[in-house]
Amino acid sequence: MASYASEVKKELTSLEVHPEHAKAELAAFLRMNGVLNLHDHQFSLDITTENPAIARRIFKLIKVAYGIEPLLIVSRKMKLKKNNQYLVRLNRDVQKILENLNIWDPAKGLVTRIPQRIMKSSEGAMSYLRGAFLAGGSVNNPETSRYHLEIYSTYEDHNEDLAKLMNEYFYLNAKMTKRRRGYIVYLKEAAKIGDFLHVVGALNAMLNFEDLRIMRDMRNSVNRLVNCDTANMKKTASASAKQVEDIQLIQKEKGIDSLPEKLQILARFRLAHPELTLKEVADQIPDGPISKSGVNHRFKKLHELAETLKE
């Protein structure tokens, strides 16, 4: 069964590739998942994934952005889960493309920060975040887990730039933390996760997420109410049991008829209706209705009398 995150990614890979924004999305893929190789003084660039839809997406992004069809190689993993592995290999104009995407600088080498032309464009930010989520993102199922969406980065400065894109353009309240082999930017608020899905274009996933979130919140509210009612019932039952115990002691030692009239009425009514709450007793007592504090005062008198009889 496909995970919730894989369903979100499936929707994102089905979106139309827009020529103006293909480079921003591709830049995220290559910066985060690309492996640069050098053979016979020639660069090649590999991106490997187990998701065929993501492999097709990368293939199409390269074709739309640069008019080049990369190689698509399918192999079978022999260790652990024997899934197919998809390798997209670019072996033409690699350095030119990496320089154009601001991933490679001839003088400085690898550039790990997100370029300013993307940092200063909301449309570019949307496309880059989409690519980043497809390359290194995950999101928990809102129905079964705690709310959590994250994107993993190898480089700290890249992680900082992702958080800046999320927060400065889309107010997502993204947080950062270090992992053993890298860094993550993450969201914990359900509403912000829904906003992120909308930003990157996963509209169906966003609507589904909101439906599941609302249902989960409703269930939690009902459970809280049930728990509260149960606690109140236990509290009522405990108080009633103590009151009945006091009255039964008075009845045994002195008799209810020995009590003042108001206490007699309350004592007999409580013995007949041990299930009622204090408010219900106050409303339904034969010489009432009276206030809860009035009923409570009478019960206190009965308790004091019962305590003297125990001595």
UniProtKB/Swiss-Prot annotation:
InterPro entries: Homing_endonucl, Sporu_reg_WhiA_N_dom, Sporulation_regulator_WhiA, Sporulation_regulator_WhiA_C, WhiA_LAGLIDADG_dom. The keyword RNA-binding does not apply. GO terms for molecular function: DNA binding. The keyword Cell division applies. Keywords: Cell cycle, Cell division, DNA-binding. GO terms for biological process: cell division; regulation of sporulation. Residues 277-311 bind DNA. Pfam families: HTH_WhiA (PF02650), LAGLIDADG_WhiA (PF14527), WhiA_N (PF10298). Belongs to the WhiA family. Involved in cell division and chromosome segregation. PANTHER family: CELL DIVISION PROTEIN WHIA-RELATED. HAMAP family: HTH_type_WhiA. This is Probable cell division protein WhiA. It comes from Lactobacillus helveticus (strain DPC 4571). The lineage of its organism: Bacteria, Bacillati, Bacillota, Bacilli, Lactobacillales.
